[in-house]
């Protein structure tokens, strides 16, 4: 039934204009033929007959037929008496359609939850189309606020699809004008907000206005989920400082997330194929995989093209590593200007060397020397991040090795489908980064990741309370600061993609029960904890991977350990090597918290 309804809807959307034009022509033909047949017996003069026929046809379209209902009329005239007013009504309604839809859409924000989108441009319209079709059978309500009025040919299809379009001075209006506009939007009914102007400074200006409005008129249902487009990251320091100022519980009425198309593409890449798939495959088919804890090999990532997308892939891969204990993520960058770009990346992220090993291959990707330059690299994963689809495909074809190759096909849906269906040199390649799959509520507002993170946080708190703090109530998700939420999202993604599948291969149910039963006794006894880890190498390996992932996350956010500047506000005493962590009795006790994720999602 749903397929038939969709087929009829598509047919009407495609042929609506032609069907209405055909109906108008049929009505005009009936009006002329019927009027001619009706007046020809009564009028002998030819010129007068033509004039009367034309005038009668016009009157039929204006709801004023010349003949009465009781008068005998030809069949064509009788049909025209009903068909012509119908065509006139359709034409009048289409002229008023934009105004009527806008008024009804504006009224519906009082009664239905909606998603607010502030922005302009093709990417913004793609996101709006994805949002309005994301509500299942009933389309989700979307309100689009633009800086300047949209052309009718763009606005009318949106409003026909259930999107209400407003042109409001949220960016450059006076404070009074912004207040009036925000009160008209009734943000207490909003389910989320997306600030998606190409100019990032406008997004930040709207963010401050929305925050001030919600502080004055607070919502009853908690913080408003808000996604802020950050573009190329030029304003990232300002946005990071803003988030640090509002880290405290209840400090901001907004649950702020930052996004860019490059970061969304990187997340999409590793959602399609996990970074640690090669490491997990090494344990398949083994009779006793728990005895192969020393055979795990670190991931070796090749990034072709170190632009905004390549940088985002590097950071996302670092968040999903390590895949082997005591080994940094090994990244090789292939670009014509690799040395200069790597120097810029290292200056931008000064702690990057603590969790990533970087190498540069500076050469033309279309060079005949490319296979020789990459020979023996031992890569386990490759990401081709060039913006030009043809260059990306040629680079993927030139790569040699039995490892997955993600090919960025930005805006090339047809090429992406062909790549999915092709074999030969592209049998190991898969597409990522298509705009239609990126600009969705699940990725932009992070609903899918947040659902997984909230479930992970609830399970983690329940285990922590049961094992260590029975009298302490768990901390709710909304009470966490922005850094802790980001940390939980990263932890949930890593556990779901790598740590839990690895645990299921390494640990039996009996070993898991031993860990669960012994953990509560080890919290205050470092010696017992060391004994547990030495007796069960698989448990020690999983705890070490989680500790090193956690260290990498804090290093990426500017934190320093004992070997750094301890006067820095971003200091944590447990940011140390695994062996050093175990040697110190106080820091060794924190390994218990690295073991809690292993107990979640029992096999």
Task: Put a short name on every predicted segment.
Residues 567-602:
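Amphipathic alpha-helical binding modules
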Residues 2-32, 41-55, 63-544, 577-579, ...:
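Cytosolic regulatory regions of ion transport systems
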Residues 557-565, 586:
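C-terminal amphipathic alpha-helical interaction region
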